[in-house]
């Protein structure tokens, strides 16, 4: 199973994605979530997910900056 981590600042969207996608049915394991890139980064470094789903516009650290740091 591939490990998935979700980063989204809108709690309604984050909860909707987390609860309405049958992750295991598609071969994914939902590993965690964060509301912005700054909060997500230490969690991502610890969990080391295979897939990162992130919003682009977020406070503190946006999804583009987060993706750039994670891929370095």
Say what each PLM segment does.
Residues 58:
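Receiver (REC) domain active-site loop signature in two-component systems and cognate sites
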Residues 45-48, 69-72:
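Conserved phosphotransfer cores of two-component systems
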Residues 55:
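Active-site residues of response regulator receiver
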Residues 7-8, 34, 52:
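Conserved sequence signature across two-component system core domains
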Residues 15, 41-42:
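Alpha-helical elements of the RecA-like P-loop NTPase motor core of helicases
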Residues 10-32:
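Two-component/phosphorelay signaling modules centered on CheY-like receiver
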Residues 1-3:
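Non-catalytic signal-transmission and effector/linker regions of two-component phosphorelay proteins
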Residues 36-39, 62-65:
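Acidic catalytic/metal-coordinating carboxylates
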């Amino acid at each position: 199973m591939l490990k998935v981590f979700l980063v989204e600042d809108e709690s309604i969207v984050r909860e909707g994605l987390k609860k309405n996608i049958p992750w295991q049915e598609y071969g994914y394991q939902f590993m965690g979530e964060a509301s912005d890139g700054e909060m997500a980064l230490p969690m991502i470094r610890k969990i080391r997910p295979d897939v990162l789903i992130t919003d682009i516009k977020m406070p503190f650290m946006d999804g583009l900056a987060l993706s750039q740091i994670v891929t370095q």
